[in-house]
Amino acid sequence: MQENLRFASSGDDVKIWDASSMTLVDKFNPHTAPHAISSVCWSSNNNFLVTASSSGDKIVVSSCKCKPVPLLELGEGQKQTCVSLNSTSMYLVSGGLNNTVNIWDLKSKRVHRSLKDHKDEVTCVTYNWNDCYIASGSLSGEIILHSVTTNLSSTPFGHGSNQSIRHLKYSLFKKSLLGSVSDNGIVTLWDVNSQSPYHNFDSTHKAPASGICFSPVNELLFVTVGLDKRIILYDTSSKKLVKTLVADAPLTAVDFMPDGATLAIGSSRGKIYQYDLRMLKSPIKTISAHKTSVQCIAFQYSTVLSKSGLNKGCSNKPTAVNKRTANVSAGGGGAQNPGVVREAATTSIATVPPQPTAAAVGKGAVAPQDKAGLPRSINTDTLSKEAESGKNQDFSNFDDSGKSSLGDMFSPVRDDAVVSKGGDESIGKGDGLDFLPQLNSVFPPRKNPVVSSTSVLHSSPLNVFMGSPGKEENENHDLTAESKKMYLGKQESKDSFKQFAKLISGAETGNLNASPSSNQTRSPEKFEKPEKEIEAQLINEPPGNGSSTPNPKIASSVTAGVAGSLSEKIVDTIGNSRPNAPLSSVQIRFIQNMIQETLDDFREACHRDIVNLQVEMIKQFHMQLNEMHSLLERYSVNEGLVAEIERLREENKRLRAHF
């Protein structure tokens, strides 16, 4: 539960409560005393509270930073009884006894627009998720959608004049889903795109329903209360009633706490009940709040990103997260598009191609953010399960001994992982989904590789194969011997390349002044020794993208011919020159280019082999995953337990019917 979170309740006055302890923080009444306060709503930064009374005397904006102080009065004498703020708290919509819906500009303190489409008293108003539409309900049973951008109103829809609309709420996840409750106890979910019922829950309440509220963290859950003392929880997906509770008094108001686990419910006797959804048998706290009926309950908005906000995108408010707009993407806006109600909530997935980073990426990592703070991609698997466990993972501490995990070794989204000599680890995150279509972009061919003295972070497939239970022991012994040879060759190659670098630099400055005989005898040694050392170095060096290293057996066979031909070319070049002359800059450049081209060709060959290996591994992993799923589905169902569960269900039904 968020620290210092508060909620407001209205009845004969307005009271502000601490949500955790349910203790009174403050109370005030900015309206005419005899009349109840029918509607309250918080600003997005939780500093201001807007109230309206059942008499419609005026709309009052009060500051609640310290003590509640009325700051602004609007619509005096205009009979406005219900209010709602947009996500920026710059515009206020109100409706009331004069059948009019007014949109107020709080900056200029004037009516921005008046909508006179209703034929009877307006009972409730609310903004949609992106503040482009206003939904309003009336005593005549009409629901009208008003477009803020086009200044047009929809054709009235509803169930008829005998079903007065008492409360309207938009779903926080399914953007085109609007819930309504009416006097005859019917609860309806509307598809606002087609303005037709998505589902009717008939006869759920035996008396007028008074309030509806959608869960801020669970896209399937919503709750209604009514004067029949019932609290009913619903599942929007299966369109069924999940649970029904009966209180000890008629219920008049309901709201979810931003954590999604707690309900605050007001009654006609002035009491407020706090329910925990994890143990719904009885309220965990009950307080006597008002002398008259509780008209409205409104929680402050969460000042930290709620799970629903993370699941559905990022909010555009830097200071507070509105429960209504926590799931609006940063580029959100625009009118609603026609179509059916979306069963799955939309996710804010940008189409930015992955950029190469010096990092290793593991499956399930959340996408990194660019400089503007917008996520490049969102792992939908992570998002759908985030309510159960966090999925942000840091993959770090990859050393050059090849101690990486199986997923990192063969992950097709792994990018270049190169560190300098002084670096000990490589840390990063990247996209963890939709990897198969991006193989070409993730593994680009290296056109201009650069040979330097920096040490290269590499992961040997040896560690993966040695840990694999399906391999035979003789293969493990062969690979172990190969790895030892590779390691020794790597150590020798460092010394030989240092000598080779000194030789070239000395020739370039004119310091190679050896005798003819010594030069003739030493030159072949100097350039024949690197033949073996180049071979060892190339075996140990990873491909250009640093994603993996080739099999030592394959690499040794390929390298033998390449290194042999390269050494012969170098020796021939040195032998054709004059024995007592130092190497010219042209010869040195020619040798460097030969080495560079050979290494480049070898890298590309290794790169192709590794890509093919990884694709094959992905296929094998996918086949294994499908096989595991089929086995789990086959053996996870226990017939005895299923029969026992059915028996217990029948017994519960009988007990409920009798008791």
Curated annotation (Swiss-Prot):
User: Positions modified as Phosphoserine?
Assistant: 411, 426, 468, 515, 636
* Pfam family of the protein (one): WD40
**Compositionally biased region (Basic and acidic residues):** 413-432
Instruction: Please give the positions of the paired cysteines in each disulfide bond.
Output: none
Q: Where are the transmembrane segments?
A: none
The entry's localization annotation reads: Cytoplasm, Cytoskeleton, Microtubule organizing center, Centrosome
Return one Gene Ontology term, BP aspect. mitotic cell cycle
Composition bias (Polar residues) maps to 508-522
Q: Which PROSITE patterns match?
A: WD_REPEATS_1, WD_REPEATS_2, WD_REPEATS_REGION
Placement of WD repeats on the sequence: 1-31, 32-71, 75-114, 117-156, 160-200, 204-244, 246-285, 289-332
What superkingdom heads the lineage? Eukaryota
Q: State the post-translational modifications.
A: During mitosis, prior phosphorylation on Thr-549 by CDK1 promotes subsequent phosphorylation by PLK1 on Thr-382, Ser-426 and Ser-636. Phosphorylated NEDD1 can interact with gamma-tubulin for targeting the gamma-tubulin ring complex (gTuRC) to the centrosome, an important step for spindle formation.
Residue ranges for the region (Disordered) are 383-433, 508-531
Q: Which GO terms describe its cellular component?
A: apical part of cell; centriole; centrosome; ciliary basal body; cytoplasm; cytosol; fibrillar center; nucleoplasm
Described function? Required for mitosis progression. Promotes the nucleation of microtubules from the spindle.
Protein's name in the database: Protein NEDD1
**Native source organism of the sequence:** Bos taurus
Q: What is the lineage of its organism?
A: Eukaryota, Metazoa, Chordata, Craniata, Vertebrata
